[in-house]
């Protein structure tokens, strides 16, 4: 499995708690917040309930337009807090026989991420340090192997860039070649 963001958390849960370990050789988690987002916890505590709901309604409406039949933005954000991830990690140990690795990128500046990552980057940096606009590097470390994608030049590699969300050419980073290399490395390792 190669999973991005929350997909890495869901994949770990499926492998360990849903009996999928016999069917999975490896999990590569790309920009996954294994240890959660401290900034999410802080914002959920500080933003008044009415404002939180208004933000959630806006995101939920957008997600419905994209095809999600029952979006729940607040539940998703709450699920990504540091405390929620700590609880999840306690009941989701790595499965024996499954190779776990993680990959992370980072932005050099807020403007290197598209909205809303350009807005969240400085907040994440304040609470969690080096980040991709959403996930901190330290939160993404998981498994036997950790790879940090080092952006060349002044441009960083955002949370959306690693899945080509913005369809941009980034000097020194070819997203297609990244995944081809990732798959080739897994093949070399026997997965």
Where are the regions that the model predicts?
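C-terminal catalytic-base region of ester-bond hydrolases, centering on the histidine
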Residues: 90-191
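Serine-dependent carboxylesterase/thioesterase catalytic core
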Residues: 1-85, 132
């Amino acid at each position: 499995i190669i999973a991005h963001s929350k997909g890495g958390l869901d994949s770990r849960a499926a492998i360990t708690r849903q009996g999928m370990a016999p069917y999975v050789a490896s999990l590569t988690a790309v920009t996954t917040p294994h240890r959660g987002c401290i900034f999410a916890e802080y914002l959920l505590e500080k933003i008044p309930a009415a404002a939180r709901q208004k933000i959630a309604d806006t995101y939920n409406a957008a997600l419905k337009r994209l095809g999600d039949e029952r979006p729940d933005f607040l539940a998703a954000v709450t699920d990504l807090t540091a405390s929620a991830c700590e609880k999840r990690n306690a009941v989701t140990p790595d499965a024996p026989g499954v190779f776990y690795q993680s990959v992370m990128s980072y932005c050099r500046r807020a403007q290197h991420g598209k909205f809303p990552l350009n807005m969240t980057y400085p907040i994440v940096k304040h609470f969690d340090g080096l980040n991709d606009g959403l996930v901190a590097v330290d939160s993404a470390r998981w498994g036997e192997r950790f790879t940090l994608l080092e952006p060349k030049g002044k441009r960083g590699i955002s949370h959306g860039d690693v899945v080509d969300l913005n369809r941009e050419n980034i000097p020194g980073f070819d997203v297609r070649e990244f995944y081809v290399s990732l798959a080739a490395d897994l093949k070399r390792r026997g997965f």
